Amino acid sequence: MRFKGLDLNLLVALDALMTERNLTAAARSINLSQPAMSAAVGRLRTYFNDDLFTMVGRELVPTPRAERLAPSVREALLHIQVSIISWDPFCPAQSDRCFRVILSDYAALVFFEKVVTRVAREAPAVSFELLPIADNYDEYLRRGDADFLIFPELLMSRAHPKVALFEETLVCVGCHSNKLLSEQLTLERYMSMGHVVVKFGNARTASFEEWCLLGHGLKRHVEVVVQGFSMVPFMLSGTERIATMPLRLVKQLEKTIPLRIADLPLPLPAFTQALQWPALHNSGQASLWMRDVLCQEASRMPSPHEVMRRLRIS
């Protein structure tokens, strides 16, 4: 099938090549033989009058022309998928849809487990693939490789629709035996102590509290960097290190790991965990249903003030 001289099947091949960056893997992903994919590459090069890819080792490296084509090709294919292929009404009780969600271990532990429990009741065949916060999470949404992102709203791109889920606040924590961490922690002591910090992905994307501290012109003495909040307490154990962590997660972890908790010595703002999704999914029935579930579960969460009150009592 040709449209204005272009075999539209070639766009599927081009998208697979851009995704896999390997001829064999790209062919496998769209159920083509390797010779057929090689032929498709030749036809693409002829049509666009460009090499499109060069081989570097075992990897196909796209040319600038291929890089410019890729977003439009992916958007066109996503639009076909959303508006034509996936047109059937979504029935949660009967669907076997898998939702791919990018989120931190913090969001998974304090929030998403409630979502999974509810969905297991209402849509038992629906499943989830939880993806870690990566350097290119915005690209995952744009390409349709993820259905949702849960992340601090201030750190989100403006390229996709979003909605607020719940507010969170930060506290300072240390090992239960850390005598240097007092409830009346001074800024001077906070800055001088060794810190455990969380950074996401290979680019070491800053967490919300680091982003705020840098805004105040403050740089901590970092002794350990980890890629998830759930690792932090183990890096504090038996040391005089401290960390800045979301209150809800501290409350949850404190059930099994003894922690000493103190208010931060500077007024870092509460932050909003938000939900973001690809613009092309905005009116999709599956996406709408899942967004409803996520927002309803978020609305049931206690406020940071109530969480702190319960923590002080316990």
Curated annotation (Swiss-Prot):
Residues 23-42 bind DNA. InterPro entries: LysR-type_TF, LysR_subst-bd, NodD_PBP2, Tscrpt_reg_HTH_LysR, WH-like_DNA-bd_sf, WH_DNA-bd_sf. Pfam families: HTH_1, LysR_substrate. Keywords: Activator, DNA-binding, Nodulation, Plasmid, Repressor, Transcription, Transcription regulation. PROSITE patterns: HTH_LYSR. It comes from the Bacteria. GO terms for molecular function: DNA binding; DNA-binding transcription factor activity. Residues 6-63 form the HTH lysR-type domain. SUPFAM superfamilies: Periplasmic binding protein-like II, Winged helix' DNA-binding domain. Disulfide bonds: none annotated. Belongs to the LysR transcriptional regulatory family. PANTHER family: HTH-TYPE TRANSCRIPTIONAL REGULATOR LEUO (PTHR30118:SF6), HTH-TYPE TRANSCRIPTIONAL REGULATOR LEUO-RELATED (PTHR30118). NodD regulates the expression of the nodABCFE genes which encode other nodulation proteins. NodD is also a negative regulator of its own expression. Binds flavonoids as inducers. This is Nodulation protein D 1. It comes from Rhizobium leguminosarum bv. phaseoli. The gene is nodD1.
